[in-house]
Curated annotation (Swiss-Prot):
Protein name: Steroid receptor-associated and regulated protein
Comp. bias regions, Basic and acidic residues: 1-16
Designated gene of the protein: Srarp
Region (Disordered) residue spans: 1-30, 96-149
Residue spans of biased composition, Polar residues class: 17-26
Taxonomic lineage: Eukaryota, Metazoa, Chordata, Craniata, Vertebrata
A biological process from GO: positive regulation of intracellular estrogen receptor signaling pathway
Length: 163
């Protein structure tokens, strides 16, 4: 079988040889992240909930993975009195927040990071509820709400992907 002398076919053949010879193609503009890190915060306790370690063995790394993007971080808030099965509570300390803040990319949102409302919507901010008496445990819920609110202000920039 004879090859055509057409330059387009020659360049196509040459590029396929280059690909199979081990040269890596140039990076795609958006590479997929290699991992997805998820943080869960229980709104009822104001604590971070860590997921139990996975029992699945780690994936073997391939020799040629091409372009690799850093992991994507996601923060998930949930409400309730019970924690998920197989989870362990870890309190949100200021040190943990500072460590997470060091890994953040610069803020690229439309508004300023401090553009959160000064207070979260709730019965303590409702003008109708101002005259009513607080139920037992309301102070504890308010304290938990404040912890979560301050934690969220510190983690405002984590809505996107770490670059």
């Amino acid at each position: 079988m004879a090859f055509s002398k057409d330059p387009r076919r020659t360049s196509l053949r040459d590029s396929s040889v280059e690909m199979s010879s081990g040269t890596q193609p140039s990076c795609a503009p958006k590479a997929m992240p290699t991992a997805h890190v998820t943080f869960l915060i229980d709104c009822a306790t104001g604590k971070q909930v860590s997921l139990a370690a996975s029992t699945a063995p780690p994936h073997a790394s391939r020799a040629n993975q091409g372009c690799v993007a850093p992991p994507m971080k996601t923060f998930v808030m949930f409400r309730g009195k019970t924690t998920m099965l197989g989870t362990q509570n870890i309190s949100l300390s200021r040190g943990a927040l500072d460590g997470a803040k060091d890994t953040l990319p610069p803020y690229r949102g439309l508004g300023a990071p401090h553009s959160l409302p000064a207070s979260l919507p709730g019965p303590q901010n409702d003008p109708k509820a101002q005259g009513s008496s607080l139920k037992p445990g309301a102070t504890e819920k308010h304290s938990t709400r404040e912890k979560v609110k301050h934690s969220l202000k510190a983690l405002t920039c984590l809505c996107g992907q770490v670059e």
